Amino acid sequence: MSAKAAEGYEQIEVDVVAVWKEGYVYENRGSTSVDQKITITKGMKNVNSETRTVTATHSIGSTISTGDAFEIGSVEVSYSHSHEESQVSMTETEVYESKVIEHTITIPPTSKFTRWQLNADVGGADIEYMYLIDEVTPIGGTQSIPQVITSRAKIIVGRQIILGKTEIRIKHAERKEYMTVVSRKSWPAATLGHSKLFKFVLYEDWGGFRIKTLNTMYSGYEYAYSSDQGGIYFDQGTDNPKQRWAINKSLPLRHGDVVTFMNKYFTRSGLCYDDGPATNVYCLDKREDKWILEVVG
């Protein structure tokens, strides 16, 4: 497991899609051999040079949803060809290096050359030429097509946030400051600060999500709600409908997710930064700032 896994991330193994397909085909119908120069790119297409993070364009089982961010640790595929079973794998370096390979092959007369390429799809990340098999057959002859048996990938994702249990920090995506709790008007209230000591737990019930502080200075006053003026305070009990929030991401939530919180009572108002007289976390009309969820520990 990478060092990154200790910082709120974990490595998990998932089933992925892998297929063999014709990467290059040439029929030499002449009476002499023919040389052909072939150029291939092995590894991931469209690699971001600044980060190895991939954004899923489709789900991976129940683990990764569309839009989730992850990194690829390795890919492993077992396959059968010519009545034999084999296994091939790509390391993290091989996946991301996008290596260009050039070489020349010689095709005998009256023969068909087929290059079978093994491609893998990991949440929309297209990994080409994991492996290749070159086959020469008579033109019109029977080919031995390789078949995938199993295909798995190790991916690095944010640790899952278990509702009602996992302690998190909530960070303003633009300002890079954390939600903290201070006393205002003899109530615990939310404001931004640089301290990482303030922890929260997310809950979900019939009315939406609730945000519980673990750092209230008034016993029992712990669920974030929007006042009529838009200030964010922490309330007793769970009956107040202004405590309910909608999160713009499907479950499961994970470390590093960037989300918005829209109030379920003031339905057009979202959790946001605003430079108020004493605190600066508000729920305001037609506002929905982005917040980063960070797993604690």
Curated annotation (Swiss-Prot):
Places the protein is found: Secreted; Target cell membrane
Biotechnological applications: This toxin represents an excellent tool for visualizing distribution and dynamics of sphingomyelin in cells.
Consequence the record notes for mutating residue 187 to A: Loss of ability to bind sphingomyelin, and induces hemolysis only at high concentration
Site (Crucial for binding sphingomyelin and inducing hemolysis): 20, 245, 291
Tissue: Expressed by coelomocytes.
Gene Ontology CC terms: extracellular region; membrane; other organism cell membrane
Disulphide connectivity of cysteines: 272-283
GO MF annotation: an example: toxin activity
Binding site for an N-(acyl)-sphingosylphosphocholine: 185, 227, 233, 282
Effect seen on changing residue 117 to A: Decrease in ability to bind sphingomyelin and to lyse cells
Cross-referenced CDD domains: PFM_lysenin-like
Region of interest: N-terminal cap domain: 10-33, 108-156
Assigned keywords, A-Z: Antibiotic, Antimicrobial, Cytolysis, Disulfide bond, Hemolysis, Ion transport, Membrane, Secreted, Target cell membrane, Target membrane, Toxin, Transmembrane, Transport
Domain of life: Eukaryota
Site location (Important for activity): 209
BP GO terms, sorted: defense response to bacterium; killing of cells of another organism; monoatomic ion transport
Region: C-terminal receptor-binding domain, residue numbers: 157-297
Phenotypic consequence of residue 128 to A: Decrease in ability to bind sphingomyelin and to lyse cells
Effect of residue 21 to A: Decrease in ability to bind sphingomyelin and to lyse cells
Positions of region (Beta-hairpin domain): 34-107
Main location: secreted
Subunit structure: Binds to sphingomyelin as a monomer by using its C-terminal domain. Forms a nonamer when sphingomyelin/lysenin ratio is lower than ca 500. Oligomerization, but not binding, is influenced by the fluidity of sphingomyelin.
Family per similarity comment: Belongs to the lysenin family.
Function: Pore-forming toxin that defensively acts against parasitic microorganisms by forming pores in sphingomyelin-containing membranes. Has hemolytic activity and is also cytotoxic to spermatozoa of some species of invertebrates and many species of vertebrates and to amphibian larvae, guinea pig polymorphonuclear leukocytes, chicken fibroblasts, normal spleen cells and various tumor cells. Is lethal for various species of reptiles, amphibian, birds and mammals. Induces smooth muscle contraction.
Protein name: Lysenin
Organism, as annotated: Eisenia fetida (Red wiggler worm)
